[in-house]
Amino acid sequence: MESELLAFEHVTCSADSVSLNAVSFRLNRGENLVIFGPESSGVDLISPLIAGIIHFSGGDIYYKGRPIKNFTFSEELAYRKDLGYLQKDYGLINNMTVEQNISLPLQYHSQLSGEGIRDVVDGFVRELNLEHCRDFRPVRLLRSEALKTAYARAIALDPDLLLFEHFLEGQCLINAQTVLRSIERRFVSGNKSVIFVTYEPERFVSFADRFLMLDHGAIVFMGTRDDFLRADNEFLAQYMRSSTEGPMTIL
């Protein structure tokens, strides 16, 4: 039987003129979901809501069957360890090196010794080809190097749920292949779950089990990879054509 990991139940939220209106969806353990839509659609509220950065005004968000708003302090700490969040601006600490940024969650949320933390960081540095810049601070990094550093930090605690937010947009796709290969190897199969929030859903066809599209705070398409590729939905068809003609209102 499928095990539900995350659920939105009629979630309503407004922030900076963008809103979600009674949005509901579920994510099972081991399932990968792409959430997309135009600007002002509400897609950019999803990850901050899950991460607890912003708060919803109606409905509930459940993690492993428990409403996150009712978490005790210890449950909230466990939830944060279970959650890996790669933000669209990468969120690197400016006065820390690549190595220090990657090690940060391990220092605060693991029982590893200093040597154990170094071993984990060394593994990420080798896997992601960061040896040449491990002592650089973010200001010296190429955009692809910043992405790889933020990605390593997001997955350092081996979380059950990963949020990848617009992480490829503005990237050189050749240089980003190292991260994409790592995602495929680590998360496409198994019991980890990934939510990709993006304006470019076609990039994630090989990774995703399901696709969900928002427009003006409401779900207008939800389906499997095959449903997405057929594009029978009028909102989806307009979006994939980048057309001004269709049911969506263009800003």
Predicted regions, residues:
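Helix-to-loop junction immediately C-terminal to a conserved catalytic motif
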Residues: 51
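Conserved ABC transporter NBD signature motif
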Residues: 59-69, 79
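Conserved ABC ATPase "signature" region
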Residues: 115-133
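Q-loop/switch helix immediately C-terminal to the Walker
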Residues: 96-107
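Conserved ABC ATPase "signature" C-loop
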Residues: 216-217
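C-terminal boundary and immediately downstream tail of ABC-type ATPase nucleotide-binding domains
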Residues: 226-251
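Conserved ABC ATPase signature
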Residues: 137-145
